[in-house]
Structure formats: structure tokens, C-alpha cells
Amino acid sequence: MKNFYRKTLIAAFLIGSAATAFSQQMPPIPTDPDVRTGKLENGLTYYIRHNELPEKQADFYIAQKVGSILEEDNQRGLAHFLEHMCFNGTKNFPGNSLREYLESIGVKFGVNLNAYTSIDETVYNINDVPVIREGIIDSCLLILHDWADDLTLDPKEIDKERGVIHEEWRTRTGAMMRMYET
């Protein structure tokens, strides 16, 4: 019996060692050679790729390594709430001016302008932006900058968004789950 346990332990050790060695020898994930990448002094990693199609359109994304996993129990939902607040005023686009500007150039909220929060990331996107005028790309990059570091978090907007978040939670959560959580 001792011999059996010893052999099992040795086999487990060898399998574990082989798995560790194998995982360290995995090749890197292939990257698209047309994607330019870099890292800014502030730690932001960027990826830029030129596309010919669709013509005169661009997509903009900012992905932050923050999500619900970083919340304490008394902060539950805060990451999602901040995601919503990005559309309610920033330093360079106060109040509703962010939506108004993007809609004026053909970007529709909820279709081409959206965001999501998951366990470990929050991603904002502005898609299918018609880059037909000078300054549109710069404005979209400024929006990404503001989303990363310059939300206004106006108390009136916070109160308005609180109701939106509550209704979103209510419609996505079944009655039994809501009763369980209260």
C-alpha cells in the first residue's frame, strides 16, 4: 500500500513538472504585423491598425483592466455605475455634449457608442465613426482620454443614473433573485 502511494505521488509530481515545463514553452500569441503597438509613459498600451474598408470609417476602443472583481462587498456595482457615468459628462465634453457631438457626426448611442463591464475589464467603444472631416479622429481620441481620466461625476447626473442602473438591474434579474438578494 505504501508503495502504491509513493508511486502515485511520484507520478503526480512528474505530471505537474511536465505541465509546468510545457506551459513555459508555449509560443507567444501571434500578432498581426499590420498592428502598431506601443506603451506610453503613463502605462497605457495602444494598438493601431489602418484599414481600407469600410472607407472613411474608424473604430475606437479603450479597455481598462478594471471590473467587478476589484470591488469590495459594499461597492458592488460601482464599476458598472462608473461605466454609465462616462456618458454623462467629462472634462472636455460636459453634460450631454459627448453624445450630442457624436450623434452630430452620425454615431448612434447604443449602436455605435457603447460600453460593458465584466469581472476583470471595462471596455468602451465608438464604432463606425465617419472620419470625413478634419478633427473627428482627434475628438474621438480626446473622448477616450476623458473616459480614462476625466469624468466630471456631477451629483445631478449621478442621481439620474442611479435610477437607470436600478431599472437595468431590475429588468435583468428575475424576481426570485431580487428577493434572495434583499
Question: What are these language model-derived features?
Answer:
Residues P28-A63:
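Mature N-terminal segment immediately following signal peptide/propeptide cleavage
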